[in-house]
């Protein structure tokens, strides 16, 4: 019963985080400080391999490392795309690309991890 209530509350309160927005050095810290936030680090020259997932129960932001190399260095981004899931400003999960610069984690995998973070709040 408890799980059913949690699932229903997640469905009712879920927000789809598509229409991703770009963040920069100036607003990065304030944006990731909010609840569950997904940040995709990518490069404009590799836009074809960008994930840009439409996920629920999170905010989704993009960082172009060719413009914000300080963020690339701070978060040790060595390959792109790299997707980091933050919870209240703290890195929780990191998804890395394969040798073809494509993200191995699909949308379903990333969403599952976000859902687990959400459910953990109720335990």
Annotate each language-model stretch with its function.
Residues 4-13:
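Sec-dependent N-terminal signal peptides
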Residues 15-19:
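Sec/Tat signal peptide C-region and signal peptidase I cleavage site
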Residues 21-57:
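Local sequence-structure signature of Cys/Sec-based thiol-disulfide redox active-site neighborhoods
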Residues 30, 74-75:
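Short amphipathic alpha-helix with an adjacent loop that forms part of the alpha/beta core around
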Residues 65-70:
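N-terminal post-signal-peptidase region of extra-cytosolic proteins
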Residues 75-87:
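Structural micro-motif
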Residues 85-123:
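Non-catalytic, surface beta->alpha helical segment in thiol-disulfide oxidoreductase systems
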């Amino acid at each position: 019963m408890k799980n059913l209530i949690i699932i229903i509350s997640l469905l009712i309160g879920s927000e789809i985080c598509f229409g991703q927005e770009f963040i920069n050095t100036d607003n990065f810290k304030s944006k990731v400080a909010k609840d569950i936030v997904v940040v995709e680090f990518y490069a404009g020259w590799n836009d074809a391999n960008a994930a840009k997932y439409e996920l629920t129960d999170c905010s989704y932001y993009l960082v172009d490392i060719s413009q914000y190399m300080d963020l690339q260095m701070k978060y040790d981004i060595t390959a792109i795309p790299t997707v980091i899931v933050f919870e209240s400003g703290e890195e929780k999960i990191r998804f890395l690309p394969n040798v073809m610069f494509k993200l191995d984690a699909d949308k379903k995998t990333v969403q599952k991890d976000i859902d687990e973070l959400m459910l953990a709040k109720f335990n």
